[in-house]
Design a protein with these regions (language model features):
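A short Gly-Trp-Pro
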Residues: 1-12, 18-183
């Protein structure tokens, strides 16, 4: 990993009105094929002018960071939260200005999952694909990274190590007033 990846980078929406500041190396770079990510991706892509969320194979490419290392420095008032169900602890934040999917926030967790398209280069190579048992029928996955049918022990171990480094805290994401949307 290059030194720049351990520094501070900015992640922004397509039009640049929403900007996140990200410090430090990512926890993991993964693609998810769960039914929730696929459904959320379809919903976000239906918004006017929205950039693609789902890859051609139906996966969602994510770069996961510690929640205490990501903050919104501009445009937080433009973020809208999409929840697949009203009671869901998982929300996907979308920049309403250009309908760019920004990140997924599991509100009970200690990490933020940034959509790969929002993270500037260089990004570490894809480390794994998870939840591949839910991929679309007929999709053949390349063997360039491990393909796990569910969440892998390796994925969970990386999250646990990050949580331990945070003193087992699960902070709230600060710097954004995200209004829930029901679409």
């Amino acid at each position: 990993m290059s030194p720049k990846q351990h520094g501070t980078v900015t992640a922004s929406c397509r039009c640049g009105a929403v900007v996140l500041e990200v410090t430090g190396a990512p926890i993991v770079h993964a693609a998810c094929y769960c039914t929730s990510c696929q459904e959320a991706g379809r919903r976000i892509e239906q918004r006017p002018g929205a950039p693609s969320v789902l890859d051609a194979d139906g996966g969602t490419d994510f770069v996961v960071y510690r929640k205490d290392r990501v903050r919104c420095v501009r445009g937080g008032e433009r973020l809208e939260a999409l929840r697949l169900k009203p009671e869901s602890p998982t929300r996907r934040l979308v920049a309403a200005c250009c309908n760019s999917a920004m990140f997924l926030d599991f509100t009970k967790g200690h990490w933020l999952t940034l959509y790969r398209a929002r993270v500037p280069e260089p990004v570490p190579p894809l480390e794994m694909r998870v939840m591949t048992a839910n991929r679309r029928e007929g999709v053949m996955l390349p063997q360039d990274a491990p393909n796990y049918p569910a969440h892998s022990g390796r994925f969970m171990w990386k999250l646990l190590l990050a949580w331990a480094a945070m003193g087992f805290r699960a902070p709230k994401f600060e710097g954004a007033q995200a209004y829930d949307i029901r679409r």
